[in-house]
Amino acid sequence: KIMTSIIAFDLIKSGDLKLDEKFIISEKAWRLSTAGYSSMFVMVGDEVSVENLLKGIIIASGNDACLAIAEGIAGSEENFAEIMNEKASELGMTNTNFANSSGINDPDNYSTVRDIAMMSQYLIKNHPEYYELFKETKFTWDRTGGDPITQGNRNPLLYKNIGVDGIKTGYLNSEKYSLASSIKRGNRRLIAVGSGFKTKNSRSKQSRKLLIWGLSNFKTIRISEKNKPFTELSVWQGKKNKVLVHLNRDVYKSIHKKDKKHLKIKINYEGPIQAPIQKGDILGSVNIYIKDEKVNTFDLVSSENIKKQNIIARILGSINFLIWGDV
């Protein structure tokens, strides 16, 4: 259901889908609402807006709403699953496969808690305005030909008053109860994913415990601010002998408090760098290590243009380098 929402959000963001666009409910989608699964309770032939279907998926956990979205976007659930898998590949979800839009039991539906965390992070980061839906505690569906139905959000941690604002519950016969949850305290956000809980109560209790443990035991450190000078690299035969470089994104790292002393940042580049240099050129990389294990790599980008020296200055510079080894 998280991935189904992501596909819809991506299309809305690109302008290829509108919230007020309506999809006609098929008999196949309606039958899901009568089969005992969590549902939005759509009716055959109903014309339902994308906005309401998304609320039905996110808040009411409607499997029928998932299928309606899938058919409306891709023509069939099979086609939609292909789109889901393409997105999973794009996100680096290497141990995931989607066979349908809802997560209903199918041997070809599988994932890992890590992949689900990556997917959740993508949704939160890239669609913050729509992520707001995940903290809504109820949804009223004024359905055609029937009384309005109000359903509560199935995420139990939304009601625990600890700051959780999403994201999604799950259930499979094989893995029982699962939950992807997220909490924000100040500028820190943590995502926790758990699976294999035997009861709803243990899912809620253990997921809450995991989030609180994360808040208590981990610290988020800012490595670099987007487009702000990070360091200088040596330049060869340039009008300046140093070039400012930056990282083109904000870089934060959450680490266990006891590992802070093991955090190392190493700069890699083949230098001195030959001028001319253009602003935006990738000149090297920054590697982040914890306990000598590389955990992240980021490009070092030139913050400025460096012109090449004239011929006389280059000759003198070469002589100076041969004598003193200094650029």
Q: Whereabouts are the PLM-identified features?
A:
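Domain-terminus/edge residues, biased toward the C-terminal soluble/receptor-binding domains
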Residues: 93-94, 107-110, 114-327
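Active-site-adjacent loops and short helices of periplasmic peptidoglycan-processing enzymes
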Residues: 2-117, 121-125
